[in-house]
């Protein structure tokens, strides 16, 4: 009783080593699964971050290019204006005359021009640096009467003829770009005309986009920006002596020229950085993608910032979700397989005693299987032998079909040979007579004619002899034109009175197909013979066409006739052995022809109705 209980217990519960092994495998699986999840989350996060940054970079480069184009358009719009005004003779005459009334009328003209071009201010400075006319002459902040000798744009225009200078207005306290042009007369310098361009509209457009943009000069000072608090700040520290010189020039008024709250994180390439910036109103730093591009025809650079946080976080989140969607089913599948493996192990452990009985039965069954295997091998050998015999029979059928065709054309060939033989006899008699008379020249001509006739007989018999051979069955490059001409030659004698019904479009000499010439001639002879017999009742109205075409590595040969067509009951089993409508036919010609074409990787199809029949043969192009 105790032994029975122990036996049942051993079957229900696995052994202690097996329990330890199962527990150890589950701990290993848990550790590997944890590592796989961590690695997957980290890798997918990196990939998601890279893809998100790449997408942001592409968008940022497009945006910075558009912003630079907008800024360039504004600059080009106003650059021509000072030059045109400097060529105005009325303006030069006013400076020469130095009359207050003339200057007032000039101010009115400049006022209209500034309103039409939307320039901030247009004003004229005499050679002493005093503004004599201005478009804002009616306003409290009028430039008229102010001294601008210290301004770089005045000095540059006097020295070089034209100048551009970005600065804070000393009167208006508004920043802008001053574009100046020298006015010259016959006696030299008369004065300078200046157009001030303010970028309020450009900054408003940038601000509306929701992404910060700003322009810095060659010293790194912010000139134009969508964030007003950043104006006249710097993207890096400027040497103290240069800061003193800038402040003394009053170019930016009393601006402190402090560095932007910007830290470089890493460089991603030319004109592309990842930076951290403390935005106005924010306590912490925000990470941005900083894309830079130069502004043509200036020393400026346009910087465009795109926040990385939301887009990159979304990209990382999506990539990690996708990774988990892929990984978790795999882990679940692995757990299922592991559980299944343990179940099998437990089952094996519980059935340990039954295994010996099973092995004994396996030994018995192995003997039966060995005997069955021997019988199966014997059957396989028998099947292979039968298959070889079948192939031999098929080859014999092909050869028999070829010889049957040869027998059909033999009578006609004999007739065709009899004619040149009779002619040869006549030429030989004539040659003997000429030789008896000593006339060697006519005798030689007769002998040459005999030689030509023997060559003709030789070509006919050679074609018959070649066709009668079995030939090699393997596929090789074969000229399609030679196949067609050979088949027609063999049929010419038998169908001597009906060969004019043939309409053959011979392919080019270089067109070759994969096959054996003799076997392909046999296919074509079968098809032409059927077609010529089908149109025989139509006498002169019968027509048999041979056409070739190539497409996608295949060559198509079409044999078409305008005969009565193939009856429906015959057409259904057309390629079935012994299916024929001819009283003397065996119904094997088309079957063999289709097998030959199939052996070379081609196919044969038929289309038939009351208007005629078309056989389409497709062969691989060599």
Swiss-Prot record:
GO molecular function: ATP binding; phosphorelay sensor kinase activity
Keyword annotations of the record: ATP-binding, Cell inner membrane, Cell membrane, Kinase, Membrane, Nucleotide-binding, Phosphoprotein, Transferase, Transmembrane, Transmembrane helix, Two-component regulatory system
Periplasmic side: 43-320
EC number(s) recorded for this UniProt protein: 2.7.13.3
Swiss-Prot/TrEMBL catalytic activity: ATP + protein L-histidine = ADP + protein N-phospho-L-histidine
Disulphide bridges, residue numbers: none
Subcellular location(s) per record: Cell inner membrane
Enzyme class: transferase
Cytoplasmic side of membrane: 1-24, 339-622
Record function comment: Member of the two-component regulatory system DctB/DctD involved in the transport of C4-dicarboxylates. DctB functions as a membrane-associated protein kinase that phosphorylates DctD in response to environmental signals.
Listed name of the protein: C4-dicarboxylate transport sensor protein DctB
UniProt organism field: Rhizobium leguminosarum
Classification lineage: Bacteria, Pseudomonadati, Pseudomonadota, Alphaproteobacteria, Hyphomicrobiales
């Amino acid at each position: 009783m105790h032994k029975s209980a122990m036996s049942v217990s051993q079957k229900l519960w696995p052994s202690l080593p097996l329990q330890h092994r199962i527990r150890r495998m589950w701990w290993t699986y848990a550790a590997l699964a944890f590592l796989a999840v961590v690695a997957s989350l980290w890798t997918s996060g990196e990939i998601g971050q890279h893809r998100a940054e790449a997408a942001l970079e592409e968008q940022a480069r497009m945006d910075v290019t558009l912003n630079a184009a907008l800024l360039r358009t504004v600059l080009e719009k106003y650059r021509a204006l000072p030059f045109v005004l400097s060529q105005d003779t009325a303006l030069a005459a006013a400076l020469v005359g130095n009359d207050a009334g003339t200057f007032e009328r000039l101010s009115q003209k400049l006022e209209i021009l500034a309103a039409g071009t939307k320039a901030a201010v247009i004003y004229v400075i005499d050679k002493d640096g005093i503004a004599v006319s201005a478009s804002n002459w009616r306003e409290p902040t009028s430039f008229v009467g102010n001294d601008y000798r210290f301004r770089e744009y005045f000095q540059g225009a006097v020295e070089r003829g034209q100048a551009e200078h970005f600065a804070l207005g000393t009167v208006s306290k508004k920043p802008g770009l001053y574009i100046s042009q020298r006015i010259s007369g016959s006696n030299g310098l008369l004065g300078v005309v200046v157009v001030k361009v303010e970028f309020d509209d450009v900054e408003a457009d940038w601000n509306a986009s929701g992404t910060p943009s700003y322009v810095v000069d060659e010293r790194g000072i912010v000139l134009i920006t969508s964030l007003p608090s950043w104006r006249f700040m710097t993207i890096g520290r400027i040497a103290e002596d240069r800061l003193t010189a800038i402040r003394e020039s009053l170019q930016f008024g009393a601006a402190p020229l402090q560095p932007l709250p910007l830290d470089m994180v890493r460089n991603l390439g030319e004109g592309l950085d990842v930076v951290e910036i403390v935005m106005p109103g924010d306590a912490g730093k925000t990470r941005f993608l900083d894309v830079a591009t130069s502004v043509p025809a200036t020393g400026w650079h346009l910087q465009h910032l795109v926040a990385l946080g939301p887009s990159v976080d979304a990209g990382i989140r999506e990539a990690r979700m996708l990774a988990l969607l892929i990984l978790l089913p795999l882990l679940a599948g692995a757990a299922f397989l592991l559980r299944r493996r343990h179940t099998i192990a437990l089952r094996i452990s519980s059935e340990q005693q039954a295994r010996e009985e099973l092995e004994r039965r396996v030994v018995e069954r192995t003997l039966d299987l060995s005997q069955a295997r021997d019988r199966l091998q014997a059957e396989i050998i028998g099947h292979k032998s039968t298959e070889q015999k079948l192939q031999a029979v098929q080859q014999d059928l092909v050869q028999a079909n070829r010889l049957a065709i040869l027998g059909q054309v033999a009578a006609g060939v004999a007739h065709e040979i009899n004619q040149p033989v009779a002619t040869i006899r006549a030429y030989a008699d004539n040659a003997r007579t000429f030789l008896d008379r000593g006339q060697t020249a006519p005798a030689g001509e007769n002998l040459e004619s005999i030689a030509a006739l023997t060559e003709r007989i030789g070509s006919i018999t050679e074609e018959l002899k070649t066709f009668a051979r079995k030939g090699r069955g393997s596929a090789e490059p074969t000229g399609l034109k030679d196949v067609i001409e050979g088949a027609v030659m063999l049929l010419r004698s038998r169908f001597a009175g009906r060969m004019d019904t043939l309409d053959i479009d011979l392919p080019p000499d270089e067109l070759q197909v994969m096959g054996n010439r003799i076997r392909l001639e046999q296919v074509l002879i079968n098809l032409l013979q059927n077609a010529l017999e089908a149109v025989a009742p139509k006498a002169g109205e019968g027509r048999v066409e041979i056409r070739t075409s190539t497409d996608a590595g295949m060559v198509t040969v079409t044999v078409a006739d305008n005969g009565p067509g193939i009856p429906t009951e015959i057409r259904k089993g057309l390629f079935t052995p012994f299916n024929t409508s001819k009283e003397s036919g065996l119904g094997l010609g088309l079957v063999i022809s289709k097998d030959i074409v199939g052996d070379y990787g081609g196919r044969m199809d038929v289309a038939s109705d009351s208007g005629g029949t078309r056989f389409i043969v497709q062969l691989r192009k060599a």
